[in-house]
Amino acid sequence: MARHSVHHQAQRPPRAKNPQEQQRRPMGQTTLPAEQEESRVKCKNCGAFGHSARSKTCPIKRWSGALPLQALGSHKEKENLKPAKAQLPFTTPGPFTTNDREKERSPSPQQQQSEAPTQTFPRTPQEKMQEAWKEPAEDCLFLRHPTMPLPVHTTKKRSVLGPVSTGPPPVNKPEMRLLCPSGHNDSPQLSTCGPTKGHGRDVTASLLPVLKSSHQTPTLSARLPANRPDMSSHGALQPAMQALALGPGLKSQAEIKHPDADAKPRPQQVRKQCGQDSRTQAPDKEPAPVPTQTFQNPAKKARFSSFQTPALRTQLPDVGAVQTLQPPRTATGLGSKEAPKATAETAATKTATLQPRVNLQPAPSSPFLGPAQGCPVLQPGPPIHVPGRPGSVTFMRGDKGQKSPRFRMPPTSRPPENSASAQSPRFSRQPEGQGPQVSTSVLYEDLLVTSSSEDSDSD
């Protein structure tokens, strides 16, 4: 009991000696905060803070009639005997905050009612402008997605124009170009560099209106993609160059001889023929100067390249044919994969190579196709202009055995005249086994004369 009395005496608050001083003190000083009381008061029976040994809350002193412990002060969270009641202050703000957030997100019906009349009022100019801005936005949304069906509609529209390209090539096509040698262009060369789709058609039949309508005499050279990988582009240039040299002086023999469609020219023979048979003239028409070229002299390569480059620059690669160009084996730059070995040329080989052969099938990657190839018939005529060999003289033997000297003028001195080949475009097709009507001895003598004259000019 003494312990309890001592403890109670220490626990009593100090009292003022005078009752007046006790009244003067404020009431807040007598009641200490709960934290200070808890730190000071400690039950000696149970050792818990917050109550004294005399308090009814002490479970040891009054076990049977003890009250349930309650949280006091800052220990409410620690002494959580009733979780439902203890979590109320923390859980209750949750629904209020969520409700507030939902209210902030979704406007109240009063606000909706207040905003609704503003939209139902007559439209102001600003609202009309806003709607005008909304319409292109919808169009943009519509234009974002139909990217896939657009090509379908365009292909269907273009399919109607498809058969136009399968027919004969038009005259006023941007791919049609006029190529001619240096000098004035009186007899241009019509070349279609673009690929045409008529594989099985006759090119000469499709381009006859072009030749009839033109007042000039174009040497026709068309290009067709084919499936024959027999010759390269160098070999395919030979019919075109021969047609260029023989343009006005072609003699039509389609009615006399029926050619073989699969006849192939030998490159060496074509080159020899270009050198010899280029000075040909039609017997029915008046003699006209023809641009001729001889591919015999290797020293004249630099001069001849200026005339050949326009035809080579206009080449366009074929879609279906892929072939590599071989370097030229001769000085003229018209080599071919099928070119024979020209090591030792004898008189027999020269006479054999003078027989002309025409390639009637298009080469796989040939930029030019020479559909017009004539059988040469030598007749005397006016002087012939040869580009690249000014001042040279050639002797030519006619049908009666007469030799007539011919002066070769520079290409800029006098342009070639028009011939009548455009009025009657008949092309002769000759098989591989047939030769010219002129005897080979006459042609061989002409070959020797021209080669000797060229050697003298080069010296």
UniProtKB/Swiss-Prot annotation:
Biased composition (Low complexity): 341-353
Residue stretches of biased makeup (Basic residues): 1-10
InterPro entries, per database record: FAM90 (IPR039213), Znf-CCHC_6 (IPR041670)
Skewed-composition ranges (Polar residues): 184-194, 415-427
Feature: compositional bias, Basic and acidic residues: 125-136
Positions of region (Disordered): 1-41, 74-136, 153-239, 259-459
Record-linked Pfam families: zf-CCHC_6
Family: Belongs to the FAM90 family.
Name of the protein in question: Protein FAM90A27P
Gene: FAM90A27P
